[in-house]
A protein has these predicted regions:
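Acidic donor-binding loop of glycosyltransferase active sites
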Residues: 229-246
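Short alpha-helical segment that forms part of, or immediately flanks, the ligand-binding pocket
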Residues: 228, 249-257
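Short hydrophobic beta-strand element within catalytic cores of glycosyltransferases
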Residues: 256-264
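C-terminal "capping" alpha-helix adjacent to the active site of nucleotide-linked donor transferases
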Residues: 275-299
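A charged, aromatic-enriched C-terminal amphipathic alpha-helix characteristic of glycosyltransferases
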Residues: 31-35, 292-327
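Conserved catalytic-core segment of nucleotide-activated headgroup transferases in glycan assembly
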Residues: 17, 24-27, 160-224
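Short beta-strand->alpha-helix junction loop in the catalytic core
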Residues: 107-108, 134-135, 148-168, 213-214
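Extended catalytic core of nucleotide-activated donor transferases of GT-like folds
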Residues: 2-8, 25, 35-144
Length: 329
């Protein structure tokens, strides 16, 4: 089965189109390896012959491909009336007539002036898929979206290449250090840095942060691999993101490398590290002391997160969800 993950309208220019070869990504314009990482890319490795398309590169003509399934996320300017024909589901279907198009809900916060065309895009698709593992499936916003669709929302977990991350970054010997993780959006940073520095000073533990450039936490200047090499040796990972509308992809990686996450309200925080999935600093400090003083407790927490990771987030798990949806249409 040939699958393409496609994005239109919002994706960074860093997300170049590529094709899968083995476990690597290669740009269409040559044999240059592409190293940008996002879990949605893992759909392209479900079967041989997968690829990723950034439609901004193909506004004039789509590439000649033999596709069976298209996972399509259309957002932002791709939903504007002036750009509709370039980013419509109909254009994909005309070029790839045998392919089933899956409308992928990459974000659930859509501006009001684009909402109508976003629903139109989802209704034009053959299926609708939203990435959610547990409690996010019950968010009121999904009930609202479902009421406007002509087909049901299918909930998948996000596929993570657990084996590759483990091989590259896992270690059972960790530095007794805290990594203070900051998402790029300011409103999602909460009191992560302040709390990390408080705990670090009180318990004499090194606090590590991503280097800032020009006062910004811009992710563009550091590769994903370099960034992971920076934080993965730390035993403690602090991320007090207060949003309950986010999946929390980063904390999935935290569980994958054998570190322990503290704080935050994203879905993966609750699934993988339920005892510390809060922004209540008194609870977090109490748990930190408990874990700090008990190797047995740390092992229990890391083992629980590892088992949940493999149960819910593996590539084969999500591939099975996709096949079940396609076979039961």
């Amino acid at each position: 089965m040939n699958l393409a993950a496609v994005v239109g309208g919002s994706v960074s220019s860093d997300w170049k189109s590529w094709y899968a070869k083995g476990k690597e990504k290669y740009l269409f314009d040559g044999d240059t390896r592409h190293v940008v990482y996002n879990p949605v890319f893992n759909y392209c490795f479900f079967w041989d012959g997968g690829c990723f398309l950034n439609l901004a590169e193909f506004e004039d003509e789509l590439p000649d491909l033999d596709l069976d399934v298209i996972l399509y996320a259309n957002e932002r300017h791709g939903l504007d009336e002036s750009n509709w024909d370039k980013y419509s589901v109909a254009r994909l279907k005309n070029k790839y007539p045998k392919a089933k198009v899956i409308g992928f809900i990459k974000e659930i916060t859509v501006p009001s002036h684009r909402y109508k065309n976003w629903i139109r895009f989802l209704n034009d698709s053959d299926y609708v898929v939203a990435p959610a593992t547990g409690r996010m499936r019950k968010l009121p916003v999904y009930k609202t979206i479902q009421s406007e669709l002509n087909k049901k929302i299918n909930f998948f977990t996000s596929p993570h290449d657990i084996e590759s991350i483990y091989d590259k970054f896992y270690s059972n010997v960790k530095d007794n250090a805290i990594f203070a993780y900051l998402p790029n959006p300011m409103h999602r940073r909460g009191r992560t840095v302040e709390f990390a520095e408080y705990i670090g000073k009180k318990y004499d533990i090194l606090v590590i942060k991503k280097p800032f450039t020009n006062g910004s936490n811009d992710a563009m200047y550091m590769s994903w691999e370099d960034f992971t090499n920076l934080w993965s040796p730390c035993l403690w990972h602090f991320n007090l993101d207060p949003s309950n509308l986010q999946q929390g992809q980063h904390v999935v990686a935290v569980a994958n490398v054998g570190s322990i996450n503290f704080g935050g309200m994203n879905e993966s925080h609750q699934v993988l590290f339920p005892e510390t999935a809060t922004c209540d600093e008194s609870i977090l400090e109490e748990k930190f002391v408990e874990y700090l003083e008990s190797p047995e407790k740390r092992f229990e927490v890391i083992t629980y997160a590892w088992n949940k990771l493999n149960e819910l987030y593996g590539i084969e798990v999500v591939k099975k969800q996709l096949l079940n949806m396609l076979e039961n249409e």
